[in-house]
Amino acid sequence: ASDVYKRQLLLVNENNATQGELTRIADVICHEIAHMWFGDLVTMKWWNGIWLNEAFATFMATKAVDVFNKDWKRWVQFGIERSAAFDVDSLHSTRPIEFEVISPDDASAMFDLLTYEKGGAVLRMLEQYVGEDQFRDGIRSYLKKHEYSNTETSDLWDSIEEFSSIPVRETMNTWIFQPGYPRIKFNNNDKK
């Protein structure tokens, strides 16, 4: 968040900057603008939900920058950049994205790779799973219902579920409240 005030991110010469530098600048600006909705307009009730503010800002920054410049292929980079979070998430010492926060150290621990990177990736997966229009309608509903108030993660899942035939809360709880990857059980009764 403090990057947005660094001189090199605000005073850039487009002719001398690399694509990586320009992408980083656009990402940071869009990330901070996304906080106007997730973090400012709607704020989480407690620190355990702060991941949603940061993950949503990470996800929306990529979405906005991809629209701004398709040549930068932000969704390809998004997948590559998130791989480190999934590596950390495969360790036995990993934690869930959302966990009970009872101390200042717990709150500080929320600002890590899993919050930003895995959280952003999980939101992208949800958007692809329920459909872009349904996801956007759910986000709009959530922001309208909870503007200038405090929410919990489940409030977002419930809003998206209103526009989808998928049990969003049930699906997302396995990704958010369990460490690591959720187990998927496949049963092929068709024998094909």
What do the PLM-derived regions correspond to, one by one?
Residues 2-192:
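Hydrophobic alpha-helical and helix-loop surface patches within well-folded domains
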